[in-house]
Amino acid sequence: MSITIFLLLCVFGLNQAATLKIMNGTECQRNSQPWQVGLFEGNNLRCGGVLIDRRWVLTAAHCSGSRYWVRLGEHSLSQLDWTEQIRRSGFSVTYPSYQGSLKSHEHDLRLLRLGLPVRLTRGVQTLPLPSTCVTAGTECHISGWGTTNHPWNPYPDRLQCLDLPIVSDDTCHAVYPGRITENMVCAGGIAGQDACQGDSGGPLVCGGVLQGLVSWGSVGPCGQNGIPGVYTKVCKYTDWIRMVIRNN
């Protein structure tokens, strides 16, 4: 099957019940998040991800599918944007200390190598890794396809963005006692505004730099007041990420 035909099938055959994601976001400006990745199994959107190299995508370790169709340069999921690129994921590397989400959410990151490098265009770009860790109070943003955790709300067709502040470690520890480690960063806690299931692995972007990956949050409904989302703290893993890319 040609890539063009497959792309058409993906665009018009998306299963809209696949996932639930950004709550109360607004439509992103087209091509403003060119590093945003959608990880699909067939027509089902499973997770988000972020392009950090022409051949490498970073996502959450609990996005554990063996192979994905990796869609880049997307804005609308039902119409051709003419910026789309599709790759097949192959080789993947999960952080060695990750124990699985049933035991611990720590070290929740995974690298996917694409079968072919992407072409860098206005709609497909890499996002830089951080050189320092983000501080509390910094305004950041997340992105993804979806609205709320209520199934009667319409599944958004276009990429959604949401601004969220970084929450202090003390505040996050108070909300999740005994569960937050130095390898996690919290953001949000504003009523009705959050990432949610299916956004996993998507980017938390602060000042044009990747600072987090959507990882976990409240057990109950997403977007509860005073309960921030928890993200993998990417600044703690940059040496490992670069080593994997360099050696593979």
Describe each region flagged by the PLM:
Residues 1-248:
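Extracellular "complement/coagulation-type" protease architecture
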